[in-house]
């Protein structure tokens, strides 16, 4: 019997303040290790008590990232997929709520044999068991675990205790901690201050963990003197104090960490000797295209309900960066608050001045719906490139029904259960569902595309797989009416029952999709829908008026390939 592979573990923690970029750090390190020939996986441990973020407000949590297997997860998993070009799964995101639920379920089944169930050992052992199971997946060399929250938060203590025990059991050469901290720059003193980092490390020491590597976020580069000071007071080798100053784009972070030799320090500490030199020319080319676009810029308006919190649209915004690079343009994003468009005095021409394309974003509930519909009407009537995603497709259907098909009171039963013309209705298998968490149509599903459509022009294939997160769907009772009025149903489920893509033939670019293309766009594989949309916006900005744009996929950033099911 073959001996199990000795998987190396890297835990990434954060201190001083939140939002330092632990997810970007984890994804960047994973990408560097993968480029050296190692098999790497990343997971996120979130300390909140929710089982998953699926029922959390976007204002509190940001975007819910959906995996191929239907998990509703943290948005950091999007960074992992975009940087590593590897798909995550249900097991890639563990919440404290899921841990507690599992422990309580086991207690109810009598699996603890009458013991008093406690955080130590039962909750901690549950975390360690989950970690051991994840390490068995995929013949891994390295498993990176990002622990959410900030050192000092009471919620994350069980995760830290599990890490402490694992390090003791596995040894320093099999598990290391990378601690991300903040070194503020005080303008009045013209100095970088290390004291917050020192205190953060002391808090980590207070739970029994000595960090192996410190990554210090800062506004300005760290001098050798500062690195030496941090290392001296935090009991870390100066070579293991890594500077990470602000940069123009998050996609430069791997290149900065490579320059700081973070990956080499990790390899040495974990005793990993068989590796190759990384080839990152494609990554440098991508960053150059992002920073120095050759064909100017375009501006896309994102009409949504959560525009005060851009993280609610994180993957959409990142997808525009990818599509901008593939089209050699910079994509500026303007967030458009849907509710504002419902005001009688709202001036669309003024609000959309300089806008080269309109995207109506996903969401739930009736707030701002009429504003979204008005933006869609403007895009349709003024031949402005338009893309609707999920709820955006449903709103596009409502707008078309009202203003083209003559169904004046058309609506979705989500917003008006008594509407005379329910062009959007609850899916049949959803009508008896009572619980909200994890019960939508979630994950990757196949879609058949019609030849000769705009969708086929960007995908160049008949069968695609895309990720979904919805309960409502187009009502097929109205399909004939729509088709007679000029709507093209260019993508459906294989049995033809579920509408996945709609588009207008006599429009520059009017495409709406029920799925979430933003969840599958990556640095090396720009999503075809976003590439095509930005290409249309680019032509619109340049004053080209042909109706059927020829969209060529780029050579630098290849088209999304068929995923493995």
Swiss-Prot record:
Q: Which residues are connected by disulfide bridges in this protein?
A: none
Q: Which reaction does it catalyse?
A: UTP + L-glutamine + ATP + H2O = CTP + L-glutamate + ADP + phosphate + 2 H(+); L-glutamine + H2O = L-glutamate + NH4(+); UTP + NH4(+) + ATP = CTP + ADP + phosphate + 2 H(+)
- Which positions in this protein are listed as binding ATP? 19-24, 76
Residues that hold CTP according to the record: 18, 153-155, 193-198, 229
SUPFAM superfamilies in alphabetical order: Class I glutamine amidotransferase-like, P-loop containing nucleoside triphosphate hydrolases
Pathway listed: Pyrimidine metabolism; CTP biosynthesis via de novo pathway; CTP from UDP: step 2/2
Instruction: Report the Pfam families cross-referenced here.
Output: CTP_synth_N, GATase
Set out the biological process GO terms recorded for this chain's protein: 'de novo' CTP biosynthetic process; pyrimidine nucleobase biosynthetic process
- Binding positions for L-glutamine? 59, 363, 391-394, 414, 471
Q: What class of enzyme is it?
A: ligase
Entry GO CC:
cytosol
Residues the record marks as active site: 390, 516, 518
Enumerate the spans annotated as Glutamine amidotransferase type-1 domain.
Answer: 299-543
Which parts of the sequence bind Mg(2+)? Answer: 76, 146
What CDD domains does the record point to? CTPS_N (cd03113), GATase1_CTP_Synthase (cd01746)
Q: How is its activity regulated?
A: Allosterically activated by GTP, when glutamine is the substrate; GTP has no effect on the reaction when ammonia is the substrate. The allosteric effector GTP functions by stabilizing the protein conformation that binds the tetrahedral intermediate(s) formed during glutamine hydrolysis. Inhibited by the product CTP, via allosteric rather than competitive inhibition.
Which family does the record claim for this protein?
A: Belongs to the CTP synthase family.
The record's section on HAMAP family has: PyrG (MF_01227)
Q: What does this protein do?
A: Catalyzes the ATP-dependent amination of UTP to CTP with either L-glutamine or ammonia as the source of nitrogen. Regulates intracellular CTP levels through interactions with the four ribonucleotide triphosphates.
Which protein, by its recorded name, is this?
A: CTP synthase
Q: Which organism is it from?
A: Pelodictyon phaeoclathratiforme (strain DSM 5477 / BU-1)
Q: Name the gene that codes for it.
A: pyrG
